[in-house]
Amino acid sequence: MASQPSSLKKKEEKGRNIQVVVRCRPFNLAERKANAHSVVECDHARKEVSVRTAGLTDKTSKKTYTFDMVFGASTKQIDVYRSVVCPILDEVIMGYNCTIFAYGQTGTGKTFTMEGERSPNEVYTWEEDPLAGIIPRTLHQIFEKLTDNGTEFSVKVSLLEIYNEELFDLLSPSSDVSERLQMFDDPRNKRGVIIKGLEEITVHNKDEVYQILEKGAAKRTTAATLMNAYSSRSHSVFSVTIHMKETTIDGEELVKIGKLNLVDLAGSENIGRSGAVDKRAREAGNINQSLLTLGRVITALVERTPHIPYRESKLTRILQDSLGGRTRTSIIATISPASFNLEETLSTLEYAHRAKNIMNKPEVNQKLTKKALIKEYTEEIERLKRDLAAAREKNGVYISEESFRAMNGKVTVQEEQIVELVEKIAVLEEELSKATELFMDSKNELDQCKSDLQTKTQELETTQKHLQETKLQLVKEEYVSSALERTEKTLHDTASKLLNTVKETTRAVSGLHSKLDRKRAIDEHNAEAQESFGKNLNSLFNNMEELIKDGSAKQKAMLDVHKTLFGNLMSSSVSALDTITTTALESLVSIPENVSARVSQISDMILEEQSLAAQSKSVLQGLIDELVTDLFTSLKTIVAPSVVSILNINKQLQHIFRASSTVAEKVEDQKREIDSFLSILCNNLHELRENTVSSLVESQKLCGDLTEDLKTIKETHSQELCQLSSSWAERFCALEKKYENIQKPLNSIQENTELRSTDIINKTTVHSKKILAESDGLLQELRHFNQEGTQLVEESVGHCSSLNSNLETVSQEITQKCGTLNTSTVHFSDQWASCLSKRKEELENLMEFVNGCCKASSSEITKKVREQSAAVANQHSSFVAQMTSDEESCKAGSLELDKTIKTGLTKLNCFLKQDLKLDIPTGMTPERKKYLYPTTLVRTEPREQLLDQLQKKQPPMMLNSSEASKETSQDMDEEREALEQCTEELVSPETTEHPSADCSSSRGLPFFQRKKPHGKDKENRGLNPVEKYKVEEASDLSISKSRLPLHTSINL
């Protein structure tokens, strides 16, 4: 952090670049009439100006320049002033010399930027006018700031014009404007100039400044060209000098001087385009010559050439201190956006971009005391008085014209020689200034190194303290580590024993693995043979079962059916004929008797009904009367509340029907889900069938898992050594049993899974069809129910609405109907009696008809019995022929079944005797063995006990550490003395006069190159007593460490 201010200070001493600002004006009237397009793009945020060099259509060929500030066409005067001038004005008040000058093509707004314009009709004052330029705003703010600060000040202004390489005073009180001024070098400032006869006017307020500006603008040379109607034909330099009085702490009065030069350059122009002829052409030539000289000066400053052509132009001579001197400088480059000004725009931007690299070294003007200023003024007054007296009294020197010419020639030659010598002196002074700067830099670096050395010594002391603490901690840790090494050695012995036992057990495990590999190979072979045999046997038995099932089913069906049918047919036909004949004869005999008995019963019943009809007539008359009275009461008590309940029921039915519609939608969704679920279920069942078959094949590979169990036994072997032998035997037996138990149910599981999977698939398909049919029926019923329900609700609502209105009409109709009912009952009883008489006649006719029918039916029955007996005889003969053919086919099926059974027995014997392999013991399996290994481990003593033991041996070590700290402090003192001596020799004036001299005295070597005579003693004394104790205690480890003192080396 200490080096950061010094670096900033160095950067300030190296200088500051000239600030370059670019301002682009908007299109003027002539450019609009010429239909010119814009080729310039200004980016205020990124501070970039882009120029299209290839035309309007080609947007790729661009030149981009970066400046300190960029202002576009819409920028106002106040924005330029606040961004560019306000920071510079503060530096002027601080006592710096500052310069702002505008450069650019003619007609691009240089004069507008520097001086501005007055608004029409003088609506605004100078300070409020938005068109006011930098000069009026600057003077306004100078007076504002100085009056606000309350300091005593004076402001002097001057306005100089450079026209055709001649100097003119625009503020001269004389009427002769053509009076030329002379320019001399300032003896007090080597880069400054003095203009003899230039009028400096003291201004006291802002109004005087505005009058001076108007006076100078009126005298300045302007002319009309094709490029600009009011083209400035000269350069103008407006200088503002501020004297400010300050009072020091001691009460001494000082004068602080700040100077601001505001330069408005004439525009560079193309004579062919501007239309300048004769006088205007000469003016343009002189303007371009001065601007070219300015460009060469800028190029020379950027390239740092030894000669800079300031004297080739009056303009560059005046701006000498502003370009590469001790002045804070800003350049405002003005450009045009029009396409036909592209060459001048690029030239201006190139010029401004080069000027960015000029480095100035701004310095505050020397503050003068009041006495020195008065003395300077009095000397100037006395000199002027003497000149005035000599002119009045003519006491000067008078010589001839020839001698005067010779004297002037000598003076000119001497002046040229003086100029050359001055330039040489300037070069030598620059070299001297560079050497002094290098010396000051080295001195500052030396001071910085001293401060760094002090901080490093302090850090070294702190690190020494930390070193002593770490040494003590290191001793403790070494003592503890020695104890840990001893315990580690014992643990290493026990671990080696355990490794030996592990090697023996791994050998036994490898033997077991080989046995398991043999058994696994045999088991795999048997499994493959078993699988192939099972497949063949399954196919054989399936064929046998199919043959047996088909043959037995056919035989049983044919034999049983034929025998039963034939026997039943014969017995049933005989019994049927007997029963038919007997029942027919009995029925024929009993029919007339039954009919006559039934007719007598019917006649009796008719008589009873006649008597009952008379009784029912009287009973009906009483019931009708009671019905009328009950009906009126029921209409009042039942119908009215029933109507209300019906309306409520209708509302509930509407809610129910809405719910039923939602239920129907849910049922449809459920149907879709059931369809998808059943399809997924069928797929899953097929996959289950395949997976069960594959799982049965994989279950036969469980023997391979035995090896993985043994691997896990091997991993846990190091932790369970004491239970190794017993667990191996038990697990091995368990694994063999597990293998047998797994192998037995494999076939049964396979058959059961196949049967169950087929049954499940069939059942699921049946259930799916049923569920689909039921769901379809349910949906249709629900939809039909919903439609009927809605119709019923609508009808019930209509009926209920009409029920209340029709209650009165219903009651009237009921009374009428009761009257008609009474008359109809009387009429009904009369008709009933007539009907009974008619029925009696019909029954007598029926008796006669039945007797005729019985005779005809008896003849038909006898005829059908004869036909039945003939058909039975024909069927008996055909049954006998079919039975003989079926017996022959059964004999052929039994012969094929015997053949298949014999081939199956031969395959079974071949599988049991040839295909299966046996596990023959080799005698290489390891026997059970008891392993001996250590079961207890040595532990290190607790850390607290070890540190207690160390504290008993610590006093001699503390003495040695204190001696080492004293020696290091002595070393630090010696090194500090050597460093101070070296720095004194570097800073001494002898080193400045003889930079090549080196430190060759007795104490001239740097401290880090000198040898210390007591280094070996310190190394011998640095041996740690705890290490001595360790060497004596653990001689077999032979650990010896030396502690060397800390040496620091600081390289300057």
Curated annotation (Swiss-Prot):
Residues 950-1026, 1033-1052 are annotated as: Disordered. One of its GO terms (molecular function) is microtubule motor activity. There is a cross-link at K476 (Glycyl lysine isopeptide (Lys-Gly) (interchain with G-Cter in SUMO2)). Residues 364-478, 963-988 form a coiled coil. The keyword Transmembrane does not apply. GO terms for cellular component: ciliary basal body; cytosol; intracellular membrane-bounded organelle; mitotic spindle; protein-containing complex; spindle; spindle microtubule; spindle pole. Its main location: cytoplasm. Keywords: Acetylation, ATP-binding, Cell cycle, Cell division, Coiled coil, Cytoplasm, Cytoskeleton, Isopeptide bond, Microtubule, Mitosis, Motor protein, Nucleotide-binding, Phosphoprotein, Ubl conjugation. Residues 17-358 form the Kinesin motor domain. ATP binds at G104, Q105, T106, G107, T108, G109, K110, T111. GO terms for biological process: cell division; microtubule-based movement; mitotic centrosome separation; mitotic spindle assembly; regulation of mitotic centrosome separation; spindle assembly. It is found in: Cytoplasm; Cytoplasm, Cytoskeleton, Spindle pole. PROSITE patterns: KINESIN_MOTOR_1, KINESIN_MOTOR_2. Phosphorylated exclusively on serine during S phase, but on both serine and Thr-925 during mitosis, so controlling the association of KIF11 with the spindle apparatus (probably during early prophase). The modification Phosphothreonine is found at T457, T925. The modification N6-acetyllysine is found at K145. Belongs to the TRAFAC class myosin-kinesin ATPase superfamily. Kinesin family. BimC subfamily. PANTHER family: KINESIN-LIKE PROTEIN KIF11. This is Kinesin-like protein KIF11. It comes from Mus musculus.
